[in-house]
Amino acid sequence: MGRSEPLEITKTIRRHQLREMVPLADSTIYEMEQRGEFPRRFALSPRCIVWDLAEVQAWLIARRAKPVF
């Protein structure tokens, strides 16, 4: 297999920070993640789940650019 570029994550956010940025229900976010429509969460430890802040911000920018209808 070829070597891939290392992932660069500069900052992660926890669930409560995500809720402040994206006012959607947890179940909606989970379903969107499963469909590939929202950045995927990952575990830093078994009890610490985070999202990449840059990915969430990019998702918000893309959503803002889409027409509502």
Give the predicted meaning of each segment.
Residues 1-35, 54-65:
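Polyanion-binding surface elements
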Residues 35-42:
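Short, solvent-exposed alpha-helical "recognition" segments
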Residues 48-52:
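Minor-groove-contacting beta-hairpin "wing" of winged helix-turn-helix DNA-binding domains
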